[in-house]
Structure formats: C-alpha cells, structure tokens
C-alpha cells in the first residue's frame, strides 16, 4: 500500500519479524520496533537497508521500555566520547532482587510470586538467566562504539544462584545486589558482560528498585549521566514506539543518522578484566582460602558455617583458578 509510510513492529522474535521488516524497508517504509532480539541480531543490516531506500529503522522501545536512551546516544551525546555504559536493563530480575532484599525471601519463592503477578513469564529463562539484558547491552554497546557488538559474544550470567544469605552479607557491606549490563572501554579494548554485582548504597543504581530500569552513561566531557524510568509494560513501551513514529513522520524522505556499522567488534575476554570479588566458603576452608587468596577482608553477617570475604583486585582468570583450588560456595563481582 503506497499510502502507508510508517509501520510498527511489536511481534517480537526473529520470525517472521525479520522478513516483514526487511520487505517493508525495501519498499521505502520506515519501521519502528520494540523487538530487542531482532535489533540485536540484525540491527546494522536493517539500518543500512532503510538508509538505502531513504527511510528509517528506529528502535527506541527495544531498550529500557519508555526510558529515552537510544535517541540520547544518537543525538544528545554525539559530542561525547562514551567509554562506559552500565545499567539495570531487566524489570523482572530487578523486581525479584528487590523483593529478596526487602523480605529475605528465597529466589524460587519470589519468582513464583512474580509469575503470579504477571511480572515474569511462565518460562522466565530469558529474564532470570540474563539473556534479555544481554541483547539490550549489545544494542547499547554497539551504539557506544559505532560498530557491531554481537550479543552471542557477551559473557552472560543470571540471578538464579543469588540467595537470601547473599543479601545478609550485602547489608553488612552497605551494598545491594543488582543484575547489571555493562560495557566499558579499557586498555584499548571493549568488554561487555551481564552479571549480578554488589554495588554500594551510595551508587545511584542501588536506588533503582522493583520493575524500574536505569542506564548510566559516562562520557569524556559530560561525565556521568543517568536515564531512569519504567523499563517494561505496555504503556511505557507504547510511549517509546509512538515517539519513534513521530520522529519518522518528521523525517519523511530524510535519513535519521544512526552510528552503527556492520563491522563486528572483537570484545576483550572478560577473563582479562580485573575487579574484586565477594566470596563465600565453608568455615572449615577459612585457612585454605586465606592462604590461596592472600590478604582478604572478612565479612561477618551471622551466617553459620561460613567464612565470607572480599578479595583484592585480580583478573577473572586468576580468581577462577584460585576459587577452583578452594571450592567456593558462591561469588559475586564488585
């Protein structure tokens, strides 16, 4: 239909959304989408097709629901050299972690409640294993560096191993636990990951609770900026889709700039990244842990039969080698 100039795609998944979107763009019709899986998988290809046919492929709703983050990266922050993006990108997992912290409840118990309230899918794997957040940080990190970050290359870890005891320790440390999507330029390379992190209560992301999302962006001139709001739900998502429709309508016959090249980025192996770790081991292994990890900071939270501590900074590879020698109950990154 030549009268149709803008199409909204909210069906989700790759099939048949990919073919429908491609055909629409090749017909010169702009497409506005909330489909993070499609954007993360075929984003640069679809953007290129759109521009070749003087139309646009916009995807504000694919990350952060109604939070404006794609447009700021493409427009407001174009003068910045962005070197880090981190955020709470999944409302389901943030709701679960918030409830676990407030009520001291187990993961399975809170997940069941979240499913009953409609905050979690019947099959919650994409959320709780971090796959949803992985696709979102792939999109954001691609826009950050201007090249294609494949979500398949991003180290991804979910929240299924987080326990109520972890939150007891976090409280003593004046921290909380959040599932973060993280992309950072470091030592001439770029690494990206999704994982639970212990973050200080003084950090702005620590105050993002329930189904809310937030994204922190660090630039060379502006420094830190943060984008916060409802990251899921039909109305916030609809708000973002409609904002893209309006943008397309304002640019009929014109190309809206998007810095996302098809060239794949080779990510730095997370094994090389250095950080500190919070570790729990059996009490009987206390001396062995001290011998292997060296100078550690003990954390006491009234959990029987355990020795918990924070390591010094070390690479992920070094930590994993030491943890294997000791046999840890769990670890959380700082």
Predicted regions, residues:
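Conserved active-site and cofactor/substrate-binding residues in soluble primary-metabolism enzymes
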Residues: 2, 41, 64, 68, ...
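N-terminal Rossmann-like NAD(P) cofactor-binding module of classical short-chain dehydrogenase/reductase
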Residues: 5-8
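Rossmann-fold NAD(P)-binding glycine/threonine-rich loop
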Residues: 11-27, 34-75
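Short glycine-rich anion-binding loops that position phosphate/pyrophosphate groups of nucleotides
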Residues: 12-14, 90, 199
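Rossmann-like NAD(P)H-binding beta-loop-alpha module
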Residues: 51-132, 139
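Catalytic, metal-anchored helix/loop core of enzyme active sites in primary metabolism
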Residues: 84-86, 94-97, 113, 119-125, ...
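Substrate-binding/catalytic subdomain of NAD(P)-dependent oxidoreductase enzymes
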Residues: 111-207, 212-214, 233
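A conserved regulatory-domain signal marking ACT and ACT-like small-molecule sensing domains
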Residues: 245-334
């Amino acid at each position: 239909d030549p009268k149709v100039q803008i199409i909204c795609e909210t069906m989700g998944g790759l099939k048949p959304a990919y073919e429908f979107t491609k055909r629409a763009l090749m017909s010169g019709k702009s497409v506005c989408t909330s489909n993070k899986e499609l954007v993360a998988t075929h984003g640069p290809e679809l953007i290129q097709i759109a521009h070749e046919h003087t139309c646009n492929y916009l995807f504000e709703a694919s990350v952060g629901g109604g939070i404006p983050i794609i447009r700021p990266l493409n427009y407001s922050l174009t003068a910045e050299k962005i070197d880090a993006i981190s955020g709470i990108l999944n409302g389901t997992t943030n709701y679960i972690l918030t409830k676990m912290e407030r009520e001291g409840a187990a993961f399975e118990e809170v997940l069941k409640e979240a499913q009953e309230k409609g905050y979690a899918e019947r099959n919650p794997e994409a959320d709780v294993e971090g796959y949803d957040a992985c696709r979102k940080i792939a999109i954001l990190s691609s826009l950050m560096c201007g090249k294609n970050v494949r979500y398949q290359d991003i180290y991804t870890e979910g929240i299924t191993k987080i326990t109520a005891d972890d939150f007891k320790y976090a409280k003593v440390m004046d921290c909380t636990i959040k599932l973060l999507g993280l992309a950072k330029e470091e030592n001439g390379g770029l690494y990206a990951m999704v994982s639970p992190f212990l973050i200080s209560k003084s950090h702005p992301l620590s105050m993002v609770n329930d189904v809310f999302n937030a994204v922190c962006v660090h630039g060379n001139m502006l420094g830190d900026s943060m984008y916060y709001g409802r990251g899921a739900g039909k109305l916030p998502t609809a708000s973002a889709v409609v904002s893209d429709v309006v943008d397309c309508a304002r640019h009929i016959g014109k190309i809206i700039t998007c810095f996302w090249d098809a060239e794949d980025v080779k990510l730095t192996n997370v094994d090389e990244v250095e950080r500190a770790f919070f570790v729990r081991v059996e009490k009987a292994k206390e001396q062995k842990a001290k011998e292997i990890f060296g100078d550690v900071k003990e954390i006491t939270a009234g959990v029987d039969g355990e020795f918990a501590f924070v390591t010094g900074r070390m690479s992920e590879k070094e930590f994993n080698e030491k943890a294997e020698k000791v046999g840890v109950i769990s670890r959380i990154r700082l």
